[in-house]
C-alpha cells in the first residue's frame, strides 16, 4: 500500500522523451493541431515500457490519438474513445488512413471533383458571421462544399487533413491571417490595407493535395490498422468486458486546465458542432474532479486484468497562486478509496515553456506519470 510519500521512479524515464520529436515522429501525428497533446515520444516509451506485443490497450480520453497511433505502430490492439468530436475525428484519421499516398491522392481528387460540381448549391445564409470573418467568400464556399462531401462519405482522414489547413497565415492554409493552434484573426499584425495578398481567394484543391503529401512524409510501418474506430462516448458509458484489458494508458482531463472545444471551435463548427460549449464541461474544482476520477478508476479496475497496469499522465494544476498535485489526489483515490490498486511508480516530467500552448496561462507546468497495478 502507498503511504503519503510521493514515489519517484529511480530511473529518469523522462529523459527518453526530452526534446522535440517533430522531425522524427510519424507524420500522421501532425495531420492537424491539438492543444495540450501528448508527445509521441512519451507515448512510445510508455507503451513499450509497460505493455507487450499483441496486448490490448485502452485510452478512454484519447484526445489527438497519440496513444492510439503509437499502439498500432508497436503492434498492440487499441480501444479508444473521447467525448470531443474533433478528438474522435482526428484519432480515426490516424488509425484508418489510406495505406499509401497514391490511394489517398486518388480519393482526394475524387472528392474535390464532387465538391466542385456541388459548390454552387452551398448556402452561405446560415454560416455565422464569426466563421465568415476568417475566409474569402469564394474560399469558404469551396471549404463548405468539400466538407459536405467528406461528411457524407464519413472519410475521417480527409476531414482531418482539411481541418489541419483551416486557419493560419501561411500560404498553404485557407484562412485570412490567423493563429494556427487556436482560432483568432491576426488582423492587427497583418492589416488588410498593407497585406492585401493575404486576404485574397485561396483555392482549396492545391492546398489539400499539398497537405496530404506532407502527412505521408514519414509513414509508419503498420502491419495492421485498428479494426475498431474511435467512439464518441464518455468513460462511464464504455461497454467493456470485465478483466478484458491488459493496460490503460491515458491522460484524463484535470481541473479545467485546458478548454479543448473552445480552442477548436472553428474546426468543431465545420464538423457540424456549432455549440462547442457543451463539449467543454468544466471540471473546475476538486470535488468534481474527484467524482470523475473515482468513477473512472472504478471502471478501470473492473475492465483491467489482474496485474494489469493503469498509466495516467496527469498535470499539476495552478489555482489561486498555489499548485495542486492532482496526481497525489488520484493515487490516494486508487489506493485508499477504490482499493485494489497499488502504485508502482510516479515519474515527474517538467513541461518547458516551448511545449505549453499558453505561456502565461494558469495551466500545467509539470506532469506526473502515475503507474497503478490492479492487485485484486
Language-model-derived ranges and their functions:
Residues 43, 55-74, 78-85, 91, ...:
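Conserved proline-anchored active-site loop of SAM-dependent methyltransferases
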Residues 131, 253-292, 318:
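Mobile active-site "lid"/loop adjacent to the S-adenosyl-L-methionine
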Residues 86-154, 272-280:
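Conserved phosphoryl-transfer catalytic core
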Residues 1-52:
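S-adenosyl-L-methionine
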Residues 29-34, 126-138, 281-291, 312-328:
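Acceptor-substrate binding/catalytic loop of class I
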Residues 290-306:
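A short glycine-rich, Lys/Arg-flanked "PGG" loop and its adjoining helix->strand segment in the class I
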Residues 318, 324-327, 331, 338-376:
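Class I S-adenosyl-L-methionine
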Residues 140-249, 255:
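SAM-dependent nucleic-acid methyltransferase catalytic core
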Amino acid at each position: 500500500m502507498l503511504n503519503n510519500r510521493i514515489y519517484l521512479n529511480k530511473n529518469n524515464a523522462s529523459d527518453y522523451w526530452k526534446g522535440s520529436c517533430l522531425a522524427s515522429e510519424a507524420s500522421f501525428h501532425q495531420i492537424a493541431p491539438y492543444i495540450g497533446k501528448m508527445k509521441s515520444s512519451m507515448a512510445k516509451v510508455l507503451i513499450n515500457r509497460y505493455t507487450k506485443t499483441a496486448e490490448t490497450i485502452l485510452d478512454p480520453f484519447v484526445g489527438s490519438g497519440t496513444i492510439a497511433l503509437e499502439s498500432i505502430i508497436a503492434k498492440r490492439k487499441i480501444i479508444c474513445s473521447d467525448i470531443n468530436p474533433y478528438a474522435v475525428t482526428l484519432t480515426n484519421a490516424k488509425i484508418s488512413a489510406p495505406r499509401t499516398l497514391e490511394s489517398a491522392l486518388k480519393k482526394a481528387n475524387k472528392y474535390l471533383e464532387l465538391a466542385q460540381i456541388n459548390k454552387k448549391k452551398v448556402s452561405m445564409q446560415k454560416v455565422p458571421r464569426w466563421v465568415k470573418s476568417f475566409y474569402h467568400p469564394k474560399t469558404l464556399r469551396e471549404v463548405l462544399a468539400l466538407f459536405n462531401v467528406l461528411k457524407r462519405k464519413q472519410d475521417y482522414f480527409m476531414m482531418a487533413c482539411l481541418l489541419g489547413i483551416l486557419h493560419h497565415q501561411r500560404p498553404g492554409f485557407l484562412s485570412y491571417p490567423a493563429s494556427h493552434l487556436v482560432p483568432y484573426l491576426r488582423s492587427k499584425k497583418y492589416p488588410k490595407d498593407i497585406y492585401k495578398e493575404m486576404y485574397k481567394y485561396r483555392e482549396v484543391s492545391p492546398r489539400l493535395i499539398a497537405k496530404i503529401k506532407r502527412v505521408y512524409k514519414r509513414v509508419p510501418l503498420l502491419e495492421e490498422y485498428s479494426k475498431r474506430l474511435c467512439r464518441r462516448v464518455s468513460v462511464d458509458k464504455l461497454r467493456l468486458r470485465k478483466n478484458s484489458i491488459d493496460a490503460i494508458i491515458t491522460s484524463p482531463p484535470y481541473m479545467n486546465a485546458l478548454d479543448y472545444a473552445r480552442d477548436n471551435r472553428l474546426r468543431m463548427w465545420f464538423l457540424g458542432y456549432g455549440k462547442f460549449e457543451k463539449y467543454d464541461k468544466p471540471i473546475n474544482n476538486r470535488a468534481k474532479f474527484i467524482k470523475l476520477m473515482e468513477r473512472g478508476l472504478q471502471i478501470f479496475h473492473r475492465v483491467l486484468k489482474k496485474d494489469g497496469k493503469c498509466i495516467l499522465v496527469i498535470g499539476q494544476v495552478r489555482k489561486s497562486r498555489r499548485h495542486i498535485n492532482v496526481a497525489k489526489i488520484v493515487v490516494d483515490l486508487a489506493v485508499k478509496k477504490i482499493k485494489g490498486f497499488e502504485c508502482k511508480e510516479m515519474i515527474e516530467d517538467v513541461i518547458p515553456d516551448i511545449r505549453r500552448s499558453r505561456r502565461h496561462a494558469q495551466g500545467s507546468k509539470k506532469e506526473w506519470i502515475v503507474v497503478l497495478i490492479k492487485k485484486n
